[in-house]
Amino acid sequence: MPKPKGTCGATKMKILAVIHSNEQSGDVSYGYNIWQSLKDNFYTYMNDNDIRNVYHHLNDLCSLGYIRKCPEASDDIKQCYRITSSGSGIQEKYNHFLEVLEKNA
């Protein structure tokens, strides 16, 4: 049974951890490289068709105010994402995913 729309499950927490980790290392978070990181580190969304699910999660996280689109990007180029202060405020919920990313780095 799917979670109600607007809730934060494990996949959204993993995405927040990936974006947070990228920001800490000075990398930019795009939908594609977030998906690659989910595949490589968490063995999630292994099918190439699953990338669309990542974009649904990114849109939900934007709506919830945990991430934002980079202001310098426009709709006709790659969209990057950054953590907001609200997203940083729930870091304790995705810390264990950050540890996995650090261990695999």
Say what each PLM segment does:
Residues 89-105:
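Amphipathic alpha-helical dimerization/coiled-coil segments
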Residues 1-29:
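Short alpha-helical segments that sit at the start of domains
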Residues 30-45:
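DNA-recognition alpha helix
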Residues 62-72:
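A short, conserved structural fragment
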Residues 72-93:
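Short, cationic-aromatic polyanion-contact patches
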Residues 54-64:
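Basic amphipathic alpha-helical segments that dock to polyanions
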Residues 17, 36, 92:
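A cross-family signal for key residues in well-ordered alpha-helices
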